[in-house]
Swiss-Prot record:
It comes from Influenza A virus (strain A/Udorn/1972 H3N2). This is Matrix protein 2. Residues 1-22 are virion surface. GO terms for molecular function: monoatomic ion channel activity; proton transmembrane transporter activity. Coiled coil: none annotated.
Length: 97
């Protein structure tokens, strides 16, 4: 028998868990957090288009207008547009020659 074979052959005791304190609450908490992180990462990679599309359109919608009279909706739209128009005047256009 060669020396290499003897080195690679595992002893039965080495197959067991060497962590005697695996019931430590910190180890358990770290394991749970690691598993949850892995699950969330997998879900994010699988459904990232749906998730980010929802957030992108959800943030652009603005406040809900249910139960608001049409005249108040129109007034709100005009205020929003005037705020956008006022912000446009702050930009400086630079022309390159």
């Amino acid at each position: 028998m060669s020396l290499l074979t003897e080195v690679e052959t595992p002893i039965r005791n080495e197959w067991g868990c060497r962590c005697n304190d695996s019931s430590d609450p910190l180890v358990v908490a770290a394991s749970i957090i690691g598993i949850l992180h892995l699950i969330l990462w997998i879900l994010d990679r699988l459904f990232f288009k749906c998730i980010y599309r929802f957030f992108e359109h959800g943030l652009k919608r603005g406040p809900s207008t249910e139960g608001v009279p049409e005249s108040m909706r129109e007034e709100y739209r005009k205020e929003q547009q005037s705020a956008v128009d006022a912000d446009d005047s702050h930009f400086v256009s630079i022309e390159l020659e």
